[in-house]
Swiss-Prot record:
GO terms for molecular function: double-stranded RNA binding; metal ion binding; ribonuclease III activity; rRNA binding. GO terms for biological process: mRNA processing; regulation of gene expression; rRNA processing; tRNA processing. It is found in: Cytoplasm. Its main location: cytoplasm. The lineage of its organism: Bacteria, Pseudomonadati, Pseudomonadota, Alphaproteobacteria, Hyphomicrobiales. Residues 156-225 form the DRBM domain. InterPro entries: dsRBD_dom, RNase_III, RNase_III_dom, RNase_III_sf. PANTHER family: RIBONUCLEASE 3, RIBONUCLEASE III. This is Ribonuclease 3.
Length: 235
């Protein structure tokens, strides 16, 4: 890894990286063949949990009168794929990620999801370097202002659909994976969601969770619960 990249990340994150190999892994997509250092998938898994914990802590402190439900809505808005992808671009991470040839023309939601994953992998590296005390300043730097501004009126699509379905006929939405395609490192899931008494909808995404939310959003928009198309989220 170029020293210029490490120096740039140190400046942008406020963290001096101890493990250069781990940092390389955080910036390597699984489409890179025969990568000696591996890829960011396991780091992304860990970073997602660390991000959720520290943002939840931040919200708990910022909004002492907020209910658990409101805090959950705010949390979803701060750790979703779009927010993380926005921060990735703010940091300049997209230009630092190593990807295979077939991934270089990626765009739209799938590209945003990849950028979001890299941010979470980077969070994991900082956490493994020095624990929560090291990663907390980074989270505060890029999430604090957003935490104070995030709109608590729009809820996670699956949560809102669940509550809406319960008010309609007292049942829960049912999700079913009807198709999985794409490469192992870049899958596409197609999920159908059904609510008894209503026409089902289908959504797709880079993970089962993303596809479920996309399908839930379609019903919410169709039934007039959501007035605009929301961007896919992660977390």
């Amino acid at each position: 890894m170029k020293h210029q990249t490490i120096d740039q990340l140190k400046k942008l994150t406020g963290h001096s990286f101890k493990n250069e190999d781990l940092l390389k892994k955080a910036l390597t997509h699984s489409s890179v063949q025969r990568s000696e250092q591996g890829n960011y998938e396991r780091l992304e898994f860990l970073g997602d949990r660390v991000l959720g914990l520290l943002v939840a802590e931040m919200l708990y402190q910022f909004f002492p009168q907020a209910s658990e439900g409101e805090l959950s809505v705010r949390l979803n808005g701060l750790v979703n794929a779009q927010t993380c992808a926005d921060i990735a671009r703010e940091i300049g991470l997209p230009d630092m990620v190593h990807v295979g040839c077939e991934m270089k023309n990626l765009e739209g939601r799938r590209l945003a999801n990849m950028h979001a994953d890299v941010v979470e992998a980077l969070i994991a590296v900082i956490y493994l370097d020095g624990g929560l005390k090291s990663v907390r300043p980074f989270i505060q730097r890029y999430w604090q202002d957003r935490a104070k501004k995030i709109d608590a009126s729009r809820r996670d699509a699956k949560t809102e659909l669940q509550e809406w379905a319960h008010t309609q006929n007292g049942v829960q939405p049912q999700y079913r994976v009807i198709k999985r395609c794409g490469l192992d490192h870049d899958p596409v899931f197609v999920v159908e969601v059904s609510v008894p008494g209503f026409v089902s909808e289908v959504g797709e995404g880079g993970s089962k969770r993303h596809a479920e939310r996309a399908a839930a959003e379609k019903i919410l928009r169709r039934e007039g619960m959501w007035g605009s198309i929301e961007k896919d989220d992660h977390g």
